[in-house]
Amino acid sequence: MNAVGIDVSKGKSMVAILRPFGEIVYSPFEIKHTSHDINSLVDLIHSVDGESRVVMEHTGRYYEVLAHQLSEADIFVSTINPKLIKDFDNDSLRKVKSDKADAAKIARYALDKWQNLKQYSLMDELRNQLKTMNRQFGFYMKHKTAMKNNLIGILDQTYPGVNTYFDSPARSDGSQKWVDFASIYWHVDCVRKMSLNAFTDHYQKWCRRKKYNFSKSKAEEIYGKAKELVPVLPKDEITKRIIKQAVEQLNSASSTVEELRTLMNDTASKLPEYPIVMAMNGVGPSLGPQLIAEIGDVTRFTHKGAITAFAGVDPGVNESGTFSQKSVPTSKRGSADLRKTLFLVMDVLIKTMPQDDPVYQFLDKKRSQGKPYYVYMTAGANKFLRIYYGRVKEYLASLPQSE
């Protein structure tokens, strides 16, 4: 019974091997995340008499190299939430924080929780790629929002309110009508220096060239508003260059977002649960792949409560003696990215209002009872996850074993 505790960090790790009753098999030692050092660690673990189990914290992405390589070498690996390790064995007044002390603490945790350790399952390459793409998608969405706000801030000094003229959705290449419009009519003087007829003709030709819908009344509305606007920055080459650069940055981020959205949908469609997930209300070609990416393989969850705890939308419990709190906040100790995706799904359900959907009925019921926004949204996310778990697991069980 050998507990291998590994304190993982970037590029290197600290390893300690202990046995019950405080027996030290190997004092803490450092290894690099290289093939030579990892192979040496594998040989060392195999050489120790008795059953060995490796425990490490799943911190960021650093642990994945060791967890993957050790699992492939037929070594039992368990990855633990850092919060559980931090709260374990805090029975000393001294505060010791070092890699060696942490490795030994993780090994003691492994010994104490030996029977309850869950083995790390190798995520197949497709799911790993999908999850990585989703994290990149989230990063570029934040970047796109920042670029959009930056452009609007500049345009407020040259053509205030131009971003509100059109509400058409983004195209498949990420382009938007208001951004393309602002790229051509980047200053209010670009419009009002022309006559109404000249602007209408110019705007119509631009719509035809860009394949946008043209409306004469819209052109007249734009021209009328331009006459009343007061710009701050002058209409010169410096201002034009500033706006053109901001437009290029926004278009670049938007294009990347749409490419990732399409690629994620194509990748998710290769997974077995794709059709049953896409058939659920509130889920489309954007949110569907995000859900699949963040939840991963449903079969690794033993029951419905496990998947809600993984997302951090499970209801909390606060009881002591005769006291029992009725309304307890959720744990929020799970995946923040998954919770964000679930809230987006709930938002879609509220906007589309599918009357025959059980999750929407539940949301509408809680909302009609006067529950606060976050209460009924979180409760709806919990119910959605439970239904997701049941439907997907049942569907996967019905498939031939080869799939």
Question: Positions of the model-derived regions?
Answer:
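A detector of single, family-specific signature residues
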Residues: 1-403
